[in-house]
């Protein structure tokens, strides 16, 4: 490998919104994530059908819009 052309890898702490911290080697400085293996529903044993994340009421908006439609 050529000298001084590759980015420097360093050990950083990745912080999740749930409060969990993981350590990784990366070229980035600070890493913050929304979902990790500690709080993701599929890692927690929940099925995707049993958990719906609806942060802005989109499901209710959809149901109101199409409630009179026949399928």
From Swiss-Prot:
Q: Which GO terms describe its molecular function?
A: metal ion binding; rRNA binding; structural constituent of ribosome
Please tell me whether the keyword Metal-binding is annotated for this protein: yes
What are the binding positions for Zn(2+) in this chain? 16, 18, 36, 39
Keywords (alphabetical) are:
Metal-binding, Ribonucleoprotein, Ribosomal protein, RNA-binding, rRNA-binding, Zinc
Cofactor: how and how many bound: Binds 1 zinc ion per subunit.
Question: Which family does the entry's similarity section mention?
Answer: Belongs to the bacterial ribosomal protein bL31 family. Type A subfamily.
Gene Ontology CC annotation, any one: ribonucleoprotein complex
Give the organism's phylogenetic lineage. Answer: Bacteria, Thermotogati, Thermotogota, Thermotogae, Thermotogales
Q: Which NCBIfam families match?
A: L31 (TIGR00105), PRK00019.1 (NF000612)
Gene Ontology terms describing biological process? translation
Tell me, how does this one assemble? Answer: Part of the 50S ribosomal subunit.
Write out the function statement from the record.
Binds the 23S rRNA.
Q: Which organism is it from?
A: Pseudothermotoga lettingae (strain ATCC BAA-301 / DSM 14385 / NBRC 107922 / TMO) (Thermotoga lettingae)
Q: Which cofactor does it need?
A: Zn(2+)
- According to UniProt, the name of this protein is Large ribosomal subunit protein bL31
> Out of the domains of life, which is the source?
Bacteria
């Amino acid at each position: 490998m050529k000298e001084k052309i590759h980015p420097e890898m360093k050990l950083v702490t990745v912080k999740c919104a749930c409060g969990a911290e993981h350590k990784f080697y990366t070229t980035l400085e600070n890493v913050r994530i929304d979902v990790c293996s500690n709080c993701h529903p599929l890692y927690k044993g929940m099925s995707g059908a049993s958990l719906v994340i609806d942060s802005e009421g989109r499901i209710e908006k959809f149901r109101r819009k199409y409630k009179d439609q026949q399928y």
